[in-house]
A protein has these predicted regions:
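Positively charged n-region of N-terminal signal peptides that target proteins for export
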Residues: 1-4
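Bacterial N-terminal signal peptides
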Residues: 6-15
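Sec/Tat signal peptide C-region and signal peptidase I cleavage site
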Residues: 16-20
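N-terminal intrinsically disordered, cationic/polar leader segments
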Residues: 21-57, 62-68, 74-114, 119-161
């Protein structure tokens, strides 16, 4: 009987361990230094996401932080979360009106761009997750801080429910 109870407790503990490993930690932290800074300038008419992806490929960037971005756009396309469900629904916004590009932030995770933009004119400020179709008006300048290729940060852009 004692062995049977131990066996049941072991299965119970194994179940808890497996369940715990499947759960995402509340906080994940990695430490790194910047290897270098890349400053990317995109000319008028360039799609911002396409330009970022082109620079990532050309410079062979694996992990990086998008530190800043400025410029102006003729067209924009972004999405924002639109409810509290997991996974959340997305609301997409697309327009063909000029706005100032006041901020670009994000990450390059295992070579994949995840960027957010903020746009403004004299009446409003809008922004969200950068989508294809956001095109530079005068220009766009985006500054990227390159991190170590060894960092395991791709998981930061994934979520579990």
């Amino acid at each position: 009987m004692k062995n049977f109870v131990c066996l049941i407790v072991s299965f119970f503990l194994l179940g808890i361990t497996a369940y715990s490993q499947d759960k995402e930690p509340e906080v994940q932290v990695v430490t790194s230094e910047l290897k270098r800074i890349e400053i990317i300038r995109m000319r008028s008419g360039m799609d911002l996401l396409e330009g970022l992806n082109k620079a990532v490929k050309e410079k062979k960037l694996k992990n990086a932080v998008i530190l800043a971005g400025i410029g102006s756009v003729t067209d924009y396309h972004f999405h924002v979360v639109s409810d509290k469900n997991l996974p959340p629904a997305n609301q997409f916004t697309k327009a063909s009106v000029p706005k100032d590009l006041t901020s670009v932030q994000g990450y390059i995770l295992n070579g994949r761009v995840h960027a957010h933009i903020t746009l403004a004119d004299e009446n409003s400020v809008v922004g969200g997750h950068l989508e294809p179709g956001t095109k530079a008006l005068t220009f766009a300048i985006i500054t990227i801080g390159v991190l170590s290729d060894e960092l395991e940060i791709e998981r930061f852009d994934k979520y579990k429910f």
